[in-house]
Amino acid sequence: TFTQISAQEPPNPCGPASILSEALANNVAEDSRCFELRFYTAEPAVNGKGGIDDLHQRFREKQITLLEQHGADMIAHWQRLDNPNTVVWLLAFRDREHRDEVFATFRADPEWLALREKYSVPVNRELFFMSATDYSGIK
């Protein structure tokens, strides 16, 4: 089975300063995208199935491509060295509404459902939402 434990639901707003509350918009760029930092920590493999290697393979095989097809900008992917069962992603979207649309269509995609079934990896997922500062080189 596929299980996810979400550390932060519902997520905070993110994106350009104009769509944020005054308290959140301070120092945020007007042209900032919505950035999402994701930590996926895989549970150990059981009987040779699941685990971090299956998670990496799922990402390699199709998950990243599918997210891009649905509109996500996949900025970078990292392997944590202090916890090798954790993969870190940085994604970007036009704004929070766009992010929610991307994930809604992605989660309903039959290719994603088949891929998730093929590589059923229980994970702990942590999500952090950010907006670029007005002096950031990446927006």
Residue spans for each PLM region:
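Short S/T/G/P-rich N-terminal loop/turn motif that feeds into the first structured element of a domain
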Residues: 1-110, 120-139
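Short, surface-exposed beta-strand/loop patches at domain edges
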Residues: 113
